[in-house]
Amino acid sequence: MKRSKRVACVEATAVVALSMTSAGIAHADDELVVNTNPAASREAPADLSSLKPVVNVLAAPDTSSIVPDTGPSPYVPGVNTQSGIVTDAQTRAYGSFAIPYTTGRVQDGNQSALGTTSANFLSTTYPYRAIGKLTFSAGYCTASLIRRSVIVTAAHCIQSFGSGSAIYSGWQFRPGHYGASGATSAQIAPYGTWTWAALVRPSTWANGTDTGSGAARNNDIAVIAIAKNASNQFIGDLTGYLNYGWNNYSFVSSSKTGNLQTASVTTFGYPALLDGGAIMQRTDGPTYTTTVSGASQLWQGSNLTGGASGGPWIVNFRARDAVLSGGAAVGSSPNLAIVGVTSWGSADPNASKDNYASQFRQNTQYPNATYGNYGSGNIASLLNTLCTTAAPGGGTFASQGYCN
């Protein structure tokens, strides 16, 4: 992966460290930043091609001796759906042994940018359109919607590890982005360009004390509230948004897979290695839980390199349900859910490819089983901190509808 320069904060002027630790209240390891100048400079579509992918610049730890976890999660798995929190000890996933994978463009038919409209692009249909390119002062990453107007990405897309209050600036989100040569403005931003309103990243990422070594860290995760557009609309009302799960949600251990904790996971991103980061890419394959230098990680074969950072790792992914025949019964429907975001992986395009994600889960920094109405562990705490924060215009981001 390529290195990116560190850029000091330009717009963000309110940094808040929270110290309350009881269940349901923001955890001490959350740090909030509010955009006090949302009308600040924005990149023009023509400038996007000059941006570089932002990657995790920390050194990769030694992975020569890592092995997948074989035991179950010590915590109760759960998923936050649009109907509320569901805890399910019988979550299911399907996969095969070893780490094979497939990668391809998210497209439908002939996806030439010339002579077509955004309606032809698979990336503008749900659930793909809840994923998009996140641009900012240092380059670009990938992000996805997990609440009505909240996206999740990697903490290293907010700031360099251990850089304190020095963060990047100018975050903008383009859901369903397609930027191949000759793309029209409607294809580049089919649902518009959206500006950040506030963000939360772990204080242990900011101060450089997060559990792990090098790039492998417990909490390379951040959430960003997206401001409403000029028509006073929330982004999620146009695109929809995705569920998120925690604590090995949909992972299972079976003798068929060597008693490894595994799930079938689909990951998305805009890696610079593939189509120059201009087109959304998808990787499918079995994924395992593991521990690298003390950090809880998800592990998958993948060639989604720099630019895919912050992209979602989704279990039970499906876009269109098939019609069953031959007497087959539907059975209980598994929940599509994001269980982590891309953090780091192999940088050599000709070497064995593997990627790692900071897992959504309870851990040393985020031990609580409940953070407000948002579930367990790191992802829930970050959301709880963001959503209970005072928002411009009065009330909180939750009361204004951002976190529905």
Segments (PLM) and residue ranges:
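Terminal peptide-recognition signature
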Residues: 134, 143, 149, 153, ...
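Protease-domain processing segments flanking chymotrypsin-fold serine proteases, especially trypsin-like
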Residues: 28-145, 376, 381-404
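Catalytic nucleophile loop of clan PA
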Residues: 303-341
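C-terminal cap/linker of serine protease catalytic domains
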Residues: 335, 339-342, 346-404
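C-terminal segment of classical bacterial N-terminal signal peptides
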Residues: 18-25
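Conserved catalytic-core segment of clan PA serine endopeptidases
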Residues: 106-129, 138-140, 168-235
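Catalytic histidine site
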Residues: 124-178, 285-292, 301-302
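Chymotrypsin/trypsin-fold serine protease catalytic domain
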Residues: 217-304
